[in-house]
UniProtKB/Swiss-Prot annotation:
Species classification: Eukaryota, Amoebozoa, Evosea, Eumycetozoa, Dictyostelia
Gene3D superfamilies on file: P-loop containing nucleotide triphosphate hydrolases (3.40.50.300)
G2, as annotated region: 183-187
Region (G3): 204-207
SUPFAM superfamilies, per the entry: P-loop containing nucleoside triphosphate hydrolases
Region of interest (G5), residue spans: 336-338
UniProt: GTP binding residues: G158, R159, T160, G161, V162, G163, K164, S165
Name this polypeptide is given: GTP-binding protein A
Length: 449
């Protein structure tokens, strides 16, 4: 498997180093105050400062930090994306700086706390006594997965206030600020944990249907498209609330927006996560049950809620190429992120029916990860060839659009330069790659290339 990042260039180094300069100056100031008391230690302190600066710069050279200059745009033939480039030009420098700062904070926090995934390394870490069956099951799945790849990219999507960041807090044990009415995540960002040599990356994204209006939603979608460009997505978690009873237009609107902008193949390896699963349900859910019965109404509501999403996603999954055997149904998991969540004797978070929710989510996620069905997101290339509203399109137009996308993709990493290849070589490459791309211009099966 390989990963193509069209934003990876020499310009990233310059922006990263510039974002690290304020911290470097702070370090030099501290060392300077110490050296004033003794002139003999000035040379040693300056050498230490240089070493620290090098470590800072090497740490900030991260592909996950989005940075794109005008020079890079021209070299990658992305200048036609006026909607994306114009909206991001003014905030580009600040975004790169904020992302670099956040990456360092997550690295420090992640090394200190690992609430659940630690059982994959050693049973009984920190005094936790997880069931032997649970530990062996997860370790076996991880071993099989590591035999194929050593990294997994999970994408979090959903409306504002449904608990995306709270779910991330539960999995990684970090403390991301959470607000209900406005999206607490302003820009997409990747949080990572390395467990027993396997790296789990969860991409947190801004919420939709934000109280700030449609313009914010539109800008957030552009941010997500830019951030995902060139990244391989292994699975998607769509987050919604467990306590709601209706599957209304708001749910459909958000799902349809993601399907239109990112492509239906997004849901090939996806699951729905229903948060606030242990909250009090509406009174109608308890009709026909005893007053002291909490498990019966909870199970009935969970099954009804899961059925709503399975029915809706069934229509989307039917759009995928059937020769890849897409799933007919999408899995649905209940999740409780509150710190007051009930726990079993082993210290695991449990739902009202006694099910360990985090165990089910993580094990289900590992089962979904299949590198053969992972897709390389190339949304910035697909948008370039989008036909007008009045144009119905035909087979020839679709084939020409895909050929244009292949040409742009090959220009990113073909050596020698793609433009210097002979016509016969180019024709042969385009013919072979044309069989690998789907109708959206993406690469759904990376291992077959």
């Amino acid at each position: 498997m390989f990963n193509i990042n069209p934003y990876k260039s020499k310009t990233t180094k310059s922006s990263s180093s510039s974002s690290a300069s304020p911290k470097s100056s702070k370090i030099s100031n501290v060392s300077g105050s110490g050296s004033s008391s003794s002139s003999s230690s000035s040379s040693s302190s300056s050498s230490k400062d240089k070493d620290k600066d090098k470590r800072k710069k090497s740490f900030l050279k991260d592909d996950s930090v989005p940075s794109l200059s005008s020079k890079t745009e021209n070299s990658l033939s992305l200048t036609s994306l006026s909607e994306i480039t114009q909206s991001m030009t003014n905030t580009q420098t600040q975004t790169a700086t904020d992302a670099s700062m956040t990456a360092e904070d997550v690295s420090e926090i992640g090394e200190d706390y690992d609430p659940f995934l630690s059982i994959l390394e050693e049973p009984g870490v920190d005094g936790a006594t997880i069931e032997k069956e649970t530990t062996e099951e997860l370790q076996e799945m991880l071993a099989v997965l590591k035999g194929v790849q050593n990294e997994c990219n999970v994408l979090l999507l959903g409306r504002t206030g449904v608990g995306k960041s709270s779910t991330l807090n539960t999995v990684f044990g970090i403390d991301i600020p959470v607000h209900s009415s406005e999206s607490c995540t302003q820009d997409p960002f990747t949080y990572s944990r390395v467990v027993n040599g396997f790296k789990l990356n969860i991409i947190d994204t801004p919420g939709f249907l934000d109280s700030q209006g449609e313009l914010v939603d539109s800008n957030n979608m552009i941010k997500i498209q830019r951030y995902l460009s060139g990244k391989t997505i292994h699975c998607v978690l769509f987050v919604e609330k467990f306590t709601e009873t209706r599957f209304d237009g708001a749910h459909q609107l958000v799902i349809n927006q993601f399907t239109e902008k990112l492509g239906p193949q997004l849901w090939r390896n996806a699951a729905v996560v229903l948060t606030y699963a242990n909250s009090v349900l509406p009174d109608s859910c308890y009709d026909g049950f005893d007053e002291e019965d909490d498990v019966g109404p909870w199970k009935k509501h969970y099954e009804a809620r899961a059925l709503q999403f399975r029915k809706f996603f069934a229509g989307i999954l039917a759009q995928l190429p059937q020769d890849d055997y897409p799933p007919k149904h999408i899995p649905v998991y209940a999740m409780e992120n509150s710190r007051r969540c009930k726990r079993n004797e082993q210290g695991q978070r449990v739902l009202i029916d006694g099910t360990p929710c985090l165990h089910l989510l993580i094990s289900g996620l590992l089962k979904m990860v299949d590198p053969k069905t992972a897709f390389l997101f190339m949304g910035h290339l697909r948008a370039k060839n989008k036909p007008g509203r009045g144009h119905r399109g035909d087979q020839n137009d679709r084939e020409l659009s895909i050929m244009d996308n292949i040409t742009e993709i090959l220009k990113l990493f073909i050596v020698p330069p793609f433009d210097q290849l002979g016509k016969g070589t180019v024709a042969k490459i385009l013919e072979n790659w044309g069989k690998k791309l789907d109708k959206y211009g993406n690469l759904p099966n990376l291992l077959k290339i």
